[in-house]
Amino acid sequence: MADKMWGEEPFWGLGYEWDPDWVLTDRQKELRELLISLCEQEMRANAKRSDDELLYPRRNLELLGEHGFLGLTVPEEYGGLGENHVAFAMTCETIARYGCASTAMCYVMHIGAVSAIMYRPTPALLDKYIRPLREGKI
């Protein structure tokens, strides 16, 4: 039987005492703090401009690239940050929550493309698309 109730129904989901920080490494927490800072300092203003003018949020993605986030899930040996799916989920949530939902959506598509390349990397694909990420190139 469930220990908690949701109205008249048993509650089987996560309780209020669950803390998502439990699954983050110290490095991932540092990355989140950096992201929140970037969102507050620049991304949010860029989001307003992009939304008002119906523009692709290029500057926000460039900003993510300047700090290594475009290569978040790329192994360190190829110039990426070498993080896992938990860091990816945290990054998307943080960008959407504190900065720009459009940027978060574009970032998801970007990492999806990067992941597809990394699933079956060839020297040509690595040189053309993956290694430039370390310089922040989209």
Which ranges hold each PLM region?
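Intrinsic disorder at enzyme termini
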Residues: 1-27
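Alpha-helix capping/hinge segments and adjacent helical runs
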Residues: 2-7, 37-40, 68, 76
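Short alpha-helical segments used as structural interaction elements across diverse proteins
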Residues: 25, 29, 131-134
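A non-catalytic, amphipathic alpha-helix used as a structural packing/dimerization or gating element
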Residues: 27-41
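Glycine-rich flavin
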Residues: 44, 48-138
